[in-house]
């Protein structure tokens, strides 16, 4: 993956691995996921191997197709990151802020 730092590569691999785990839990092939999100199977394979940098719209489409919220998908890929995000100023319990995802 030319141009990516070691940390960026780790992030791509973590998200790709999570997408693969969810896809496999659903019993879907890469081809089936690709058809549902109107992307090519080789793109999905590259994502799952951490070789492709997904744009936000593709993350949204993949998450929706798999029946998982984009936030939950990211939280599964980076479980310690969610706890590191401070609540926005004025956020209270139950308002849908990061602490309530």
What do these predicted ranges mean?
Residues 57-72:
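DNA major-groove recognition helix of helix-turn-helix/homeodomain DNA-binding modules
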Residues 2, 64, 74-101:
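Short, charged recognition helix plus adjacent turn
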Residues 38-54:
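Recognition helix of helix-turn-helix/homeodomain-like DNA-binding domains
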Residues 26, 37, 47-48, 66, ...:
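Core residues of bacterial helix-turn-helix
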Residues 17-36, 61:
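Short basic helix-loop element that most often maps to the first helix and adjoining turn
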Residues 2-25:
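A short, Lys/Arg-rich alpha-helix, primarily the initiator
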Residues 19, 33-34, 44-47, 73:
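Conserved hydrophobic/aromatic packing and binding residues within compact polymer-binding modules
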